[in-house]
Each structure stands twice: as structure tokens, then as C-alpha cells.
Amino acid sequence: MHSSALLCCLVFLTGVRASPGQGTQSENSCTHFPGSLPHMLRELRVAFGRVKTFFQKKDQLDSMLLKESLLEDFKGYLGCQALSEMIQFYLEEVMPQAENHDPDIKEHVNSLGEKLKTFRLRLRRCHRFLPCENKSKAVAQVKNAVSKLQEKGVYKAMSEFDIFIDYIEAYMTMKTQN
């Protein structure tokens, strides 16, 4: 078992343990989740701010990668799946490649990835925010474009990470209002 998967399992199991006379920590954290959302998004933005200039300078493409269609998927019935797929895409495909582009930014990209993993873990604990199964065409288009662009695709995806955070915020705002 990979050490990161083992760590996630341990964190999950620790959060599930019931406190005497109370619901689980997971249930309690879910009631506070909407209130902690602005702080979590701010942490993502601050972490991205440490690498934003590097990747935006390297991004030589004029086209947008994260288009309005992705935001519409986030806001529509595919919102859950689009969010889940995009988080997975950044964690498994974009960030591992981005870490290898410059030793000076590796630590910062890694930190950004850890914050995104923590965010995903909290979303999964609170099932009403991430209960999904369907696939998003907009996410498939983003993945396809990055794959075709190769190294330039990594720069593009990382340079637009702030847009991704904005889309997360739009999705979470919609979910907390429902």
C-alpha cells in the first residue's frame, strides 16, 4: 500500500472514531465545513500564490484551458463529478509533472498538492458535498488538451489553478446554499 494511501486511511479512521456522548468527529466537522470553506480556499490561494508567477511566465499559450463549460459543469448536475475529477487530475497528473520543472518550486507545488488532498478528504467525509458517479465532458476536454500540449499543458494547467479555485468556490457556494 502506498504511504500516502495509508496516511489517508489513518486520517479517515481517526476522524471516524466516535467521541463519548457525541456524533463522530466526521459528522461534527461536516456541520462546521461550510464555515471553514473560506479559510480552506484562502489556504489554496496562498499556496498557489507561491508558484503562480513561475507557471504564468512559463505559460506561452494564448488559449484558455479551464473554460466556461467547466464552470457550467461545476454548477450543473455534474458538479460533483467535475470537481472530483479535476482534483484527481491536478493531484495525479499535473502536479507531479509540475514538481519536476524546477527544484526551487518543488516544495511549494508539493505543499499546494497537500492542501488540495486535505480539501478532498474533507469533501469526501461530508458526503453531501461529493456524492457522485457520472463523468464530465468538460473535464475530459481539459485532460485531453493538457495531454496534447505535453509540457506546455502542465504550465497552462498550473497557471490557471486560480481559476480552478474560483470554480471550486462557485460549486461549494452553490452546495452550501442548498
UniProtKB/Swiss-Prot annotation:
First and last residue of the signal peptide: 1-18
Protein name, per record: Interleukin-10
Record note on quaternary structure: Homodimer. Interacts with IL10RA and IL10RB.
Subcellular location: Secreted
UniProt KW keywords: Cytokine, Disulfide bond, Glycoprotein, Secreted, Signal
Positions annotated with a glycan in the UniProt record: N134
Role, per record: Major immune regulatory cytokine that acts on many cells of the immune system where it has profound anti-inflammatory functions, limiting excessive tissue disruption caused by inflammation. Mechanistically, IL10 binds to its heterotetrameric receptor comprising IL10RA and IL10RB leading to JAK1 and STAT2-mediated phosphorylation of STAT3. In turn, STAT3 translocates to the nucleus where it drives expression of anti-inflammatory mediators.
GO biological process: immune response; negative regulation of B cell proliferation; negative regulation of cytokine production involved in immune response; negative regulation of inflammatory response; negative regulation of interleukin-6 production; negative regulation of membrane protein ectodomain proteolysis; positive regulation of B cell apoptotic process; positive regulation of cytokine production
SS bonds (residue pairs): C30-C126, C80-C132
